[in-house]
Amino acid sequence: MTNAKKVRARRKIRRTAAGAMALAVGLTGAGILVNAVTPDAQVATAQQDEQALIQEGKDLYDVACITCHGANLQGVKDRGPSLIGVGSGATYFQVHSGRMPMLRNEAQAKRKTPRYSEAQTLAIAAYVEANGGGPSIVYNKDGSVAMESLRGANYKDGIDPADVARGSDLFRLNCASCHNFTGRGGALSSGKYAPVLDPANEQEIYQAMLTGPQNMPKFSDRQLSADEKKDIIAYIKSAKETPSQGGWNLGGLGPVTEGMMMWLVGIVVLVAAAMWIGSRS
């Protein structure tokens, strides 16, 4: 009897251990399976943040843009074009530079103090891009909007002179005919004009080249590569920030203002000299 009891006890212990082992294996397997099919927390959070940003952009759009561009971004005849497919880049340029919303319909939207903050501008841009895609804002690796990193293909703690040299050639070939060779802007036809480039930040200049706002032609990456666009920005910023070696630059408009100033000063000097000679005789 004693041996039989011992055998039954050992069998009971083995069954209990086997059951516990099976339960542990089952729970472990279930945990692994759940972990495999459950979205990563960071990805889910990022998606939620993106959706919240798009919703914020839609709310802002419905207040300020819907009248001219339509409830579905399809545009409204004689008011505003469709925004489907324009992307976040074009939206950033127009809103961040204050050109949109426009004060009134005119030949060309003028730069003015922006109505919306940087964060609100990015929200509107995210909403527009979510509806049709298009050229995107350039971001740094840390998620911030690229600014100084666009100052030349080889920018690192400062503008590379080689980038400025290449950018100067590219600017002269593609931009100077309208914007003047130092980015001072100039008059066009029908009341339009090429704006001064000084107030524009790096992202605005990049997006202007990429998307071609208003009267400006588009420069796709096939016409001007991303690095070439950056080199042009390097030249523009270098021209703005480098002091004039000759003193007062007369607005940086080149031979027109310089020639006029020389002519006016020369005439005044000649008239004064003639009057002085006449008074002496």
UniProtKB/Swiss-Prot annotation:
EC class of the enzyme, as a word: translocase
GO molecular function: heme binding; iron ion binding; ubiquinol-cytochrome-c reductase activity
Subcellular location: Cell membrane
UniProt xrefs under PROSITE patterns: CYTC
Catalyzed reaction equations: a quinol + 2 Fe(III)-[cytochrome c](out) = a quinone + 2 Fe(II)-[cytochrome c](out) + 2 H(+)(out)
Enzyme Commission no: 7.1.1.8
Alphabetized InterPro entries for the sequence: bc1_cytC-su, Cyt_c-like_dom, Cyt_c-like_dom_sf, Cytochrome_c_Oxidase_Subunit
CC terms in the record's Gene Ontology section: plasma membrane
PTM notes: Binds 2 heme c groups covalently per subunit.
UniProt cross-references to Pfam families, sorted A to Z: Cytochrom_C, Cytochrome_CBB3
Cytochrome c domain ranges (all copies): 52-132, 162-240
Record-listed heme c 2 binding positions: C175, C178, H179
Transmembrane segments: 17-37, 259-279
Residues the record lists as binding heme c 1: C65, C68, H69
Record keywords: Cell membrane, Electron transport, Heme, Iron, Membrane, Metal-binding, Repeat, Respiratory chain, Translocase, Transmembrane, Transmembrane helix, Transport
Membrane topology qualifier: Multi-pass membrane protein
Keyword Zinc: no
Role this protein plays: Cytochrome c1 subunit of the cytochrome bc1 complex, an essential component of the respiratory electron transport chain required for ATP synthesis. The bc1 complex catalyzes the oxidation of menaquinol and the reduction of cytochrome c in the respiratory chain. The bc1 complex operates through a Q-cycle mechanism that couples electron transfer to generation of the proton gradient that drives ATP synthesis.
Quaternary structure and interacting proteins, as annotated: The cytochrome bc1 complex is composed of a cytochrome b (QcrB), the Rieske iron-sulfur protein (QcrA) and a diheme cytochrome c (QcrC) subunit. The bc1 complex forms a supercomplex with cytochrome c oxidase (cytochrome aa3).
Protein name: Cytochrome bc1 complex cytochrome c subunit
